[in-house]
UniProtKB/Swiss-Prot annotation:
One of its GO terms (biological process) is protein modification process. It comes from Lactococcus lactis subsp. lactis (strain IL1403). Its EC number is 1.8.4.11. Belongs to the MsrA Met sulfoxide reductase family. One of its GO terms (molecular function) is L-methionine:thioredoxin-disulfide S-oxidoreductase activity. NCBIfam families: msrA (TIGR00401). This is Peptide methionine sulfoxide reductase MsrA 1. Has an important function as a repair enzyme for proteins that have been inactivated by oxidation. Catalyzes the reversible oxidation-reduction of methionine sulfoxide in proteins to methionine.
Length: 183
């Protein structure tokens, strides 16, 4: 087994855990904060935007069972990559989408994946997700961990709303793409 780490930010971390955690080869998914200037930030500090942190998930995975490229594919399916100022209902820099890379190999894979998404025509606006060097990852408070199991009704409502929003955004992008090609 060869363990690797990936860190992705994509809005509220509650909706980022389950889609990764249920995959074979995923060893752990932790909700937390990264990219800020305060050690051991709390949720309230991050929410207030005073700490400079972004909500993110840290994924430990067995790269012999699931690849970083597969994780990138999952990540892109969970976010609106055209929105740099948060995701869905969660607005502000603390909810911005970011791919935090651990190595040059991850950086190259993330860049290739981003370019492929741009060329796909799925989205009608530019892909604006930055690829940044991984910084210290601080686990969030325990009540945030595996939230989808702790409050399944609330999680499902948020998750379904997020899925509907993303489906609508993708549809709008495809519709505009098709209209451009028929003129």
């Amino acid at each position: 087994m060869s363990t690797e780490r990936a860190i992705f930010a994509g809005g509220c971390f509650w909706c980022m855990v389950e889609p990764f955690e249920e995959r074979p080869g995923i060893l752990a998914v932790t909700s937390g904060y990264t990219g800020g200037h305060i050690e051991y930030p709390t949720y309230d500090q991050v929410l207030s935007k005073a700490s400079g942190h972004t909500e993110a998930v840290e994924i430990l995975f067995d790269n012999e069972l699931i690849s970083y490229d597969e994780l990138l594919d999952i990540y892109w399916s969970l976010i609106d990559p055209t929105d740099a100022d948060g995701q869905i209902y969660d607005r502000g820099a603390n909810y911005r989408p970011v791919i935090f890379v651990e190595s040059e190999e991850q950086r190259i894979a993330a860049q290739k994946s981003k370019i492929a998404l741009e060329k796909s025509g799925i989205w009608d606006k530019p892909i604006v997700v930055p690829i940044e060097e991984a910084k210290t990852f601080w686990p969030a408070e325990e009540y945030h961990q595996q939230y989808y199991k702790k409050d399944p009704k609330r999680y499902q409502a948020m998750h379904k709303a997020r899925e509907r929003y993303l489906a609508l955004q993708r549809f709008k992008g495809k519709f505009k793409f098709l209209r451009k090609n028929t003129r």
